[in-house]
């Protein structure tokens, strides 16, 4: 689909490029049961588990009134592959920034299995 990317998704993409510079962020946009389009079943590996944790983090951020993680912009820095969230973020922005920061760090530490890209969600993510 050619929907414009929500602003925060753009920031999350940049965070991923900070911690995993050798890979395209697209590699993470459709991976396993939780990265990108999915959101059900048992995560199929460590990287997929990173995305499940990120989904859960966004869900708990939504419980703060009026906090919409996919639209929320925040202030952060990437220095030499290290991410930090700015102290000037309001509570929603701080929460969402930390969700994204922890996921990007998790991605950097998890092996990438090409066989788990663009899997059949119906068959494998019940």
Swiss-Prot record:
CDD domains: PLA2c
Tissue distribution: Expressed by the venom gland.
GO molecular function, one term: calcium-dependent phospholipase A2 activity
Database matches in Gene3D superfamilies: Phospholipase A2 domain
Primary location recorded for the protein, binned into one broad class: secreted
InterPro entries: PLipase_A2, PLipase_A2_Asp_AS, PLipase_A2_dom, PLipase_A2_dom_sf, PLipase_A2_His_AS
UniProt keyword annotations, A-Z: Calcium, Disulfide bond, Hydrolase, Lipid degradation, Lipid metabolism, Metal-binding, Secreted
Localization (cell): Secreted
One GO term describing the cellular component: extracellular region
Self-association state and partner proteins as the record states: Heterodimer formed between two homologous isoforms: isoform 1 and isoform 2.
Protein name: Basic phospholipase A2 1
Taxonomic lineage: Eukaryota, Metazoa, Chordata, Craniata, Vertebrata
């Amino acid at each position: 689909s050619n929907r414009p990317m929500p602003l925060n998704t753009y920031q999350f993409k940049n965070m991923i490029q900070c911690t995993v510079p050798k890979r395209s962020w697209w590699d993470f946009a459709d991976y396993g049961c939780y990265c990108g389009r999915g959101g059900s079943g048992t995560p199929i590996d460590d990287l997929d588990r990173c995305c499940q944790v990120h989904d859960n983090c966004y869900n708990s951020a939504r419980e703060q009134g009026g906090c919409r993680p996919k639209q929320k912009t925040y202030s952060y820095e990437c220095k030499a592959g290290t991410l930090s969230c700015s102290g000037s973020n309001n509570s929603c922005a701080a929460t969402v920034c930390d969700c994204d920061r922890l996921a990007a760090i998790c991605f950097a530490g998890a092996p990438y299995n090409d066989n788990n890209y663009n899997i059949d969600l119906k068959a494998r993510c019940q």
